[in-house]
Amino acid sequence: MVLSVVEFSFLMDTAREIERFCHLIYQKQFVAAQDGNISARLPDGSVMCTPTRCNKGFAKADDMIVIDMKGNKLRGERKPSSEIAMHLLIYEMRPDIKAVVHAHPAHATAYAAAGIPLNKALISEVVLALGCIPLTQYGTPGTSELTDSLKPFIPNYDALLLANHGVVT
């Protein structure tokens, strides 16, 4: 498939933006090495995402891949993240969502591991920006068990604590 100059430019801009956020979440220590993943919905309905085993601190725009909503690779050299099904489910259930970030920030992951949802107004900034952040049931990463645990929450929440795992926004 041949892209127009405008389409190619948009893809590269999106890839550079994902690269920038990969570096940011790495610098902020929200991920270590190959943890986490980022994706963005493209105007044609496809999804650009970080590949599997991608160190976010060294991610490059050229590393990004494009998949369809079934997870089939359309562009790129590497395989999609092993947790891409989580991203695709969110895009499917929430047409308003344009990007998904899954990370393991220490404090959020500690709450998730302790089984404590962020459902009280402890920090006003969090309440104003995200509202309540519920805790999902544990699901093994990369399996339908994980995506199934998210389904009840996706329609009503913009951030989720993943039990014993991390966070997705």
Feature roles, as predicted:
Residues 6-169:
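Glycine-rich flexible loops
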